[in-house]
């Protein structure tokens, strides 16, 4: 079956954005979908505006999709968009590492098929969605003044403003350095603590002004927008994004059927490092080095499909600038029985 990416795709329905590497994602999942036949269920763990799911549902006429998003507004919008596919799509309002328990407890036919046959494939397009960036009042974008919220699920957890107004100098500097790779993390943390004594942070414009004043002009000329790294770090901390990635990998790989594939799209080095490390561990035999064959029970149950981290082509980047930083890794299950469980647990 050939999947060349041709589809009557309406960019306006995807908030002005085309899903990153949609044709390549279909190619990576195609062998698993074809092997599963009528029982093929795909988990779109980062549903967003529904662009990847729409593409898969159109490209693979028999596939069913479980779409997961912690943002109820995104889930509602995507569900309306995918309503022409009727019962081939079901949405779940949850953080993506909760998909195992959602499948275990779900009542529709899609969940029943998944429980009986396992998941044929899964896609995780990590980071903030285009839809969330377009919602100015969410505070994800630094180019427009908005409340410093940044929660992907507006019902839960602390906001970016809470972090700025309550974290110690050490904790604030740590997240800026670790999650944003910010060279001036300590200097920025000092400025934040000094300014919040005058008035608590509430909106993004004040933080952006502080960053312009704190980061040296020479760096601003060569290092991109001075707010980019700080906003990324705050978003990752607010949403516990790296924790969710670490927890979902065992959840989704345990749920795969034999021949099933999990694909992760990362946009920053910390995300990709987590995926790479986990995939390497899952695909490595535990037989002691030097033995001529695997000992019983030590053979790897998974195999890495991609050679290193795949990158987008120049043609893809020209069509979709967001693809410039993407790194793609895929894993296939070789043996084992599918199971469904909560993060950090086993059934």
From Swiss-Prot:
GO terms for molecular function: rRNA (cytosine-N4-)-methyltransferase activity. It comes from the Bacteria. Keywords: Cytoplasm, Methyltransferase, rRNA processing, S-adenosyl-L-methionine, Transferase. Coiled coil: none annotated. It is found in: Cytoplasm. S-adenosyl-L-methionine binds at residues 50-52, 69, 96, 125, 132. Belongs to the methyltransferase superfamily. RsmH family. This is Ribosomal RNA small subunit methyltransferase H. It comes from Corynebacterium aurimucosum (strain ATCC 700975 / DSM 44827 / CIP 107346 / CN-1) (Corynebacterium nigricans). The lineage of its organism: Bacteria, Bacillati, Actinomycetota, Actinomycetes, Mycobacteriales. The gene is rsmH.
């Amino acid at each position: 079956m050939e999947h060349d990416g041709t589809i009557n795709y309406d960019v306006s329905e995807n908030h002005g954005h085309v899903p990153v590497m949609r044709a390549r994602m279909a190619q990576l999942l195609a062998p698993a979908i074809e092997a599963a036949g009528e029982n093929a269920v795909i988990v779109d763990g980062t549903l967003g505006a529904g662009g990847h799911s729409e593409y898969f549902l159109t490209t693979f006429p028999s596939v069913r999709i479980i779409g997961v998003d912690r943002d109820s507004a995104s889930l509602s919008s995507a569900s309306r968009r995918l309503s022409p596919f009727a019962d081939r799509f079901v949405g779940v309002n949850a953080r993506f590492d909760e998909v195992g328990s959602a499948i275990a407890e779900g009542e529709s036919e899609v969940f029943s098929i998944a429980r009986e046959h396992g998941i044929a494939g899964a896609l995780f397009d990590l980071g903030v969605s285009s839809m969330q960036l377009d919602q100015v009042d969410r505070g994800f974008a630094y180019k427009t003044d908005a409340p410093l919220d940044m929660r992907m699920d507006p019902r839960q957890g602390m906001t970016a403003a809470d972090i700025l107004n309550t974290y110690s100098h050490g904790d604030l500097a740590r997240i800026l350095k670790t999650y944003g790779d910010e060279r001036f993390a300590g200097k920025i943390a000092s400025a934040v603590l000094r300014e919040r004594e005058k008035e608590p942070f509430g909106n993004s414009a004040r933080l952006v002004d502080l960053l312009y004043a704190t980061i040296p002009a020479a760096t601003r000329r060569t290092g991109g927008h001075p707010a980019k790294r700080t906003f990324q770090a705050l978003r990752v901390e607010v949403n516990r994004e790296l924790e969710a990635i670490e927890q979902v990998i065992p959840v989704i790989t345990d749920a795969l059927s034999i021949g099933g594939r999990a694909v992760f799209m990362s946009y920053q080095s910390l995300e990709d490092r987590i995926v790479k490390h986990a995939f390497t561990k899952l695909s490595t035999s535990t037989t002691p080095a030097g033995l001529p064959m695997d000992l019983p029970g030590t053979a790897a149950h998974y195999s890495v499909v991609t050679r290193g981290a795949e990158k987008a082509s120049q043609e893809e980047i020209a069509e979709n600038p967001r693809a410039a930083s993407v790194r793609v890794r895929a894993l296939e299950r070789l043996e084992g029985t599918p199971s469904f469980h909560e993060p950090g647990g086993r059934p």
